[in-house]
Amino acid sequence: MTTDTTKQKRKLDSKQNTSPKRRKVQANGKAQPKAKKPKRVVAADSLSWRSVEIPELFDDAEGFFGLEEVEGVDVIRDGGMVKFVTAAPAAEKEDEGDDFSGFDDNPESTSLVAAEEAKSEEPAKPQSQKKQQTKQPKSETKEKKEKPAKAKKNEKQTSKTDDDDLATGSFAALAEIDETDEGADVSEWEPLGLSEEIMSSIAKLKFAKPTAIQAATIPEILAGHDVVGKASTGSGKTLAFGIPIVEKWLSINASTQSKRVAEGETKTPIALVLSPTRELAHQLTDHIKNLCAGLATSPYVCSVTGGLSVHKQQRQLEKADIVVGTPGRLWEVLSSSTKLIQAFRGIKFLVVDEADRLLSEGHFKDAKDIFEGLDKVETDDDGIIRGGKARQTLVFSATFNKGLQQKLAGKGRFDLATDSQSMEYLLKKLKFREEIPKFIDVNPVSQMAEGLKEGIVECGAMEKDLYLYSLLLMHPTQRTLVFTNSISSVRRLTPMLQQLTLPVIALHSQMIQKARLRSVERFTSSKPGSASILIATDVAARGLDIRGIDVVIHYHVPRTADAYVHRSGRTARADSSGLSILICAPEEVTPTRRLVAKVHASAAAKGKKKGSAGGVFVHSVELDRRLVSKLRERVQLAKQIADSTLAKEKIGKEDNWMQKAAEELGVEYDSEDLEKASNWSGRGSGRKSKQKEAKEMSKAEVASLKAQLKQLLSKRINSGVNERYIANGNVDIDGLLSGAKGDFLGKVEGLGVSPLLATD
């Protein structure tokens, strides 16, 4: 009987009692990770404090030295006492084994449960048991997930490094073998004494011969001298300092650098290149990467500019060989890390591109902070060490004359500074390794490119939009860059010209970084033979190397002469030709005269010495006024439509701001009362009234204006052709019959712009 009862009991236990007990065990195991550890008050001396590193560039610490920090501790103030509460028990470190929880009241139940669980591993499993077994403690599942994740991550990193080695090794060598026949003849580069790897990369870039600035500066830089290089825009200044930097990197033992990174230390970059604008920094990065693309092993080049992730840039700087950046973001990253600023003090090259802009008075304070941080005196146990002693300083720009930075408008002395005065100005701003750096000026007579033709269009102040549209229509298949002095002008001109069905792209400093890069990419990716127009502020004036820009139009007279030089330098780059047109209003005559006098003073002086009467440097562009007057109605309609859209957006933003401010103050907001109170007849009242009229324009009125404009754009402008006798030879009849697009009916050669490109 005993045996039968025991068998019956076991059957009952297996069918009825096992599942509740199993739930109980699993419930207990499930509840253990959720249970919070008891907190306890500990003494401050028993905590694991660690010292805080204070940045070296911290000017005034005011006694904040020897700081220490601790993590995972709550600070509670109890009256006048401060208590430190931690959740980590002290016995947790000492006893690593299982904790003794006492004897269980039913010790056999756990063994039975374990036995049943062992049996339940057979294929036939009840549904309830499957569900219960899938439920595991969160802590255990988390640990199980973390371990394979870390292992996979390590495997990916190792495989990635192996793949990179293969890619930069064998595949790069194969690519080099395949592309040797496609390269250009680089025999003229041989006198510069470059390595075979660099010569091969130059051949793949198809640069047959060095430019004047490259031939003059590369040997001096390779010899270890500090160099100040001056050359016209588009003369290849980027490779003038990029080639020696890569040569130096190739000569340095790469195994030492890889070992240093493997030990967890921050890598010391070989070169730091400073740029005034983000677009120029990204362009410099691309040019150096293109130079290194043909090498078997290439340096890691990274750009540090605003508008992108700071944390990602910090990670890139720790392994970078060549750093290109703007002063603001670069100083933000360097000043936050003591290791980075110490590593950057060991750079071999400091390059300042567009130095006249970076070193101008009242601008780029961060650049000054970077120079001081690199030259900061360190006091060690062994003695005093000055950082950055061994580095070369390379300075490049198209304009070094300090007099070109003076404003053209207003009263004041407009005398030109000499080369010696400009050099003294640079010596004050930068600390060169040599007492007097090598000053190389390959075009001392003129700052303008040789293939550039300059023209001026005189018009009324209120007709600039009309003449700008006329000039753009006269270049239907050319890539045009329009410069303005203000962001508001870019925002106004872009929608107006878009209403006139022109492919217009905007670029200014208040756009987010991705939008700025997208605008430059869209402008550069336009097909040759198709019109592409970029309206930009001076952010696009310096350094941007966009091939195929045929015409540069200055909507406003630049504020300074050096801005005009760099704006005009976006065209006629290298050996190509280009056209720079200045739209001048009557009130801009005085600044224009000063501009021409400053930019072409050296060329005029040289002409007088030779006994010549002095040539005309800026030609007057005579447009056909009849054709311009026929375009007036188009421009007026497009301007009304664009102004209405902008006024509604602007007033909507102002209303939102005023309404939000009124809500924060707890005041009732009534826009009509504010408008009545703000009505005045003083300066600016006319502009306010026009904005109000544009805002009150209804959708039906805007649609009517768009319909009128569409009808006008569908018709061609008659350039003097008798429409009764259209086949007299002045009209392309085949083009009309085939439906070819065009804005003019008749020939447009006599408009006064094209002959400038052919004049000498």
UniProtKB/Swiss-Prot annotation:
SMART domains: DEXDc, HELICc. CDD domains: DEADc_DDX24 (cd17946), SF2_C_DEAD (cd18787). GO terms for biological process: rRNA processing. Residues 137-161 have a biased composition (Basic and acidic residues). GO terms for molecular function: ATP binding; ATP hydrolysis activity; RNA binding; RNA helicase activity. Residues 218-418 form the Helicase ATP-binding domain. It is found in: Nucleus, Nucleolus. ATP binds at residues 231-238. InterPro entries: DEAD/DEAH_box_helicase_dom, Helicase_ATP-bd, Helicase_C-like, P-loop_NTPase, RNA-helicase_DEAD-box_CS, RNA_helicase_DEAD_Q_motif. Its main location: nucleus. Pfam families: DEAD (PF00270), Helicase_C (PF00271). One of its GO terms (cellular component) is nucleolus. Residues 451-616 form the Helicase C-terminal domain. Residues 125-136 have a biased composition (Low complexity). It catalyses: ATP + H2O = ADP + phosphate + H(+). PANTHER family: RNA HELICASE. This is ATP-dependent RNA helicase MAK5. The lineage of its organism: Eukaryota, Fungi, Dikarya, Ascomycota, Pezizomycotina.
